[in-house]
Design a protein with these regions (language model features):
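Acidic glycine-/aspartate-rich tracts in secreted/extracellular proteins
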Residues: 31-35, 66-68, 125, 132-136
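C-terminal subregion of chymotrypsin/trypsin-like serine protease catalytic domains
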Residues: 98-101, 111, 115-167
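Conserved catalytic-core segment of clan PA serine endopeptidases
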Residues: 1-41, 94-98
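A structural micro-motif recognizing beta-strand termini
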Residues: 28-35, 49-51, 107-110
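Short glycine/Trp-rich loop-beta-loop segment that forms part of the substrate-binding cleft
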Residues: 33, 47-81
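Terminal peptide-recognition signature
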Residues: 28, 57, 62, 106, ...
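Extracellular adhesion/carbohydrate-binding repeat motifs centered on closely spaced tryptophans
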Residues: 168-206
Length: 206
């Protein structure tokens, strides 16, 4: 179990956190790289998209760890603690402010525990954060919906700045003294060779 400290949580607008979905945004810096903490060290990251306009009908997905749901109408069963991906399409788009922050709703499986999951566009990039939607059991999957925030240009920069400041790059020592190498993009090298500086290294599956 990994415990977060208060200083690991970075609020977009802590003072007005509860005033509107446009302020319901925070980033958490993990105490250890998630690739190392994940099962089989297999975690990967989805790239961050630049701000753009979305239209009804555009494909979107969410990926997260929802709590168990007993609703028999869901397309795929939800198993507590296992990654769950839901696919859907944009239903509507609303402007939150004049800085490019938008709210979108989408036809999609939405259950309790998905809040905080990334909203992923058709290009496979994170555009925002899932915030709300259908959580009741017994509602057919076709009638379930979700909604969240599409990051404004300013919010995209804010996230990038956090990654640049806290993201692991280069050699990381942990996990009983083992050393791991992370590229500037956040990839952890496994099962490959790479030239770093003037030396060639070989990385095993660990």
């Amino acid at each position: 179990t990994t415990l977060f400290k208060e200083e690991d949580i970075h609020f977009w607008n802590k003072k007005e956190f509860g005033k509107g979905y446009q302020n319901d945004l925070a980033a958490v810096v993990a105490p250890v790289p998630l690739q190392i903490a994940s099962p089989n060290k297999a975690a990967t990251f989805v790239p961050l998209a630049e701000n753009k306009t979305y239209q009804p009908g555009d494909p979107v997905s969410t990926i997260g760890y929802p709590t168990d749901s007993s609703s028999p109408e869901l397309k795929k069963p939800i198993v507590a603690g296992q990654l769950y991906k839901a696919d859907g399409v944009v239903k509507s788009v609303d402007n939150y402010d004049d800085k490019g922050s938008k709210g979108i709703t989408y036809h999609m499986t939405s259950v309790s525990g998905l809040s905080g999951a990334g909203i992923i566009n058709g290009d496979g990039k994170v555009v925002g954060v899932h915030q709300h939607g259908t959580i009741e059991n017994g509602i057919p999957d076709k009638d379930r919906f979700g909604g969240g925030i599409v990051l404004s240009p300013e919010q995209v920069k804010w996230v990038k700045d956090i990654i640049a400041k806290y993201g692991v790059k280069g050699w990381y020592q942990g996990d009983n003294g083992k050393r791991y190498y992370f590229t500037p993009e956040g990839e952890m090298f496994r099962n490959k060779t790479a030239v770093i500086g003037e030396n060639q290294y070989s990385f095993d599956e660990n």
